[in-house]
């Protein structure tokens, strides 16, 4: 611990960690945000009904959750407008119960079976888009270069948000809860930008 490195404040945690690693290992941090992640077929999930979106509804503390009624309104709008399914992964029994509460009476909202991290990565990689609260899987979806919308209710996305790009946006802030309509429209903008980038 004899050597220290100065990392500028005012950037989010991912950027600051990238900058720190660049200094420690002596390279210039690339301006682009391409992480180059791939998901091995070993994580393959069977019977995923395409097209689908993923709702990352669970997080480390209750103050970072988005209200169940907002999730339900968003999922209904996604299904009505996009004719799609929405998968809800979970990691423990409390998260499973929340997923079941969100999906109750919505046949297109599918509570996932328990899965490992590789399977979760596969689910994210093959989704049209991902919506999520402040959680690690949201950052994984961002690193996989998927269309993502981060929902922040108790943390500042400037510090902990996804890496913003044409296909990745943050909404909300401490005490600022975004509406389902705003999340939907922002997600559609991200999906459109992703589809536009694939046109040759």
Tell me the role of every PLM-derived stretch:
Residues 1-200:
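Catalytic machinery of carbohydrate-active enzymes
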């Amino acid at each position: 611990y004899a050597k220290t490195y100065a990392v500028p404040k005012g950037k989010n945690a991912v950027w600051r960690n990238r900058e720190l690693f660049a200094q420690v290992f002596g390279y210039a941090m690339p301006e682009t945000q391409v992480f180059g992640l791939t998901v091995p077929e070993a994580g393959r999930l069977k019977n995923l009904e395409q097209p689908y979106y993923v709702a990352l509804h669970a997080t480390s503390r209750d103050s970072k959750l988005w209200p169940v009624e907002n999730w339900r309104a968003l999922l209904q709008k996604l299904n009505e407008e996009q004719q799609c399914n929405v998968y809800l992964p979970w990691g423990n029994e409390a998260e499973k119960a929340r997923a079941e509460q969100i999906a109750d009476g919505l046949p297109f909202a599918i509570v996932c079976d328990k899965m490992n991290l590789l399977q979760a990565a596969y689910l994210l990689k093959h989704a049209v888009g991902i919506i999520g609260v402040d959680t690690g899987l949201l950052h994984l979806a961002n690193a996989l270069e998927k269309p993502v919308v981060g929902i922040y209710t108790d943390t500042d996305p400037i510090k902990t948000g996804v890496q913003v790009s044409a296909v990745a946006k943050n909404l909300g802030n401490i005490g600022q809860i975004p509406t389902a309509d705003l999340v939907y429209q922002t997600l559609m903008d991200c999906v459109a930008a992703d589809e536009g980038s694939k046109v040759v």
